[in-house]
């Protein structure tokens, strides 16, 4: 017999699926960014793309879900900076952001990021450098379209499923050039 089998009961016939009931997962426990600046709070000049120094950032994950690359893209010029992260955690990301800001000096005014847990230490970087961080709406990747498009282009060199353990900073610099 194919399909669900009927069961007789006092109320009527019910069909029992072989897959059973859908189980619901527990709520996310990965933490939330409290007091973050929303992307809608960015100055209007950022949206118009008339002024240099406004960046979008994200991480490109490797197959092992540990090693990844931090990408920062300037919104007007499309200039790309890539930093290798040994682990996808907030300490590594904050260090990489600080190195990128030092490398770019006064050319960074704002950075717009997604809500990943790796960016939860943004306040430390904000206190150390004259940069303001903004965060996109969760699951609205198109709000950082320049960065998402660039990450797609980076995937030509670092395809999905590739282990990034053996990628080093020199490789990242060569891809970004």
Predicted segments, located by residue:
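Mobile genetic element proteins and their domesticated derivatives, centered on retroelements
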Residues: 58, 72, 78, 97, ...
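Charged alpha-helix within mobile-element recombinases
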Residues: 102, 123-133, 137-177
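Active-site beta-loop-alpha junctions of metal-dependent nucleic acid enzymes
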Residues: 61-65, 82-106
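Basic, flexible linker segments flanking DNA-binding modules
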Residues: 1-47
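Acidic/histidine-rich, metal-coordinating catalytic segments
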Residues: 106-121, 139
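Short loop/turn microsegments at loop-to-beta-strand junctions
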Residues: 68-69
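Glycine-centered loop/turn motifs
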Residues: 45, 49, 53, 161-162
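Two-metal-ion RNase H-like nuclease active-site motif
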Residues: 52-62
């Amino acid at each position: 017999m194919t399909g669900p089998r009927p069961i007789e009961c006092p109320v009527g016939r019910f069909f029992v699926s072989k897959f059973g009931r859908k189980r619901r997962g527990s709520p996310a426990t990965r933490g939330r960014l409290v007091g973050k600046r929303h992307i809608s709070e960015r100055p209007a000049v950022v949206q118009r793309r008339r002024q240099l120094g406004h960046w979008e950032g994200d991480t490109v994950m490797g197959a092992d879900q540990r090693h990844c690359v931090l990408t920062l893209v300037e919104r007007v010029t499309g200039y790309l900076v890539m930093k290798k992260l040994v682990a996808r955690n907030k300490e590594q990301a904050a260090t990489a952001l600080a190195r990128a800001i030092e490398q770019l000096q006064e050319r960074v005014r704002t950075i717009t990021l997604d809500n990943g847990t790796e960016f939860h230490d943004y306040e430390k970087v904000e206190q150390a450098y004259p940069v303001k961080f903004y965060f996109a709406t969760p699951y609205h990747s198109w709000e950082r379209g320049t960065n998402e498009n660039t990450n797609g282009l980076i995937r030509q060199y670092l395809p999905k499923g590739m282990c990034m353990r053996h990628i080093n900073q020199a490789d990242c610099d060569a891809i970004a050039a």
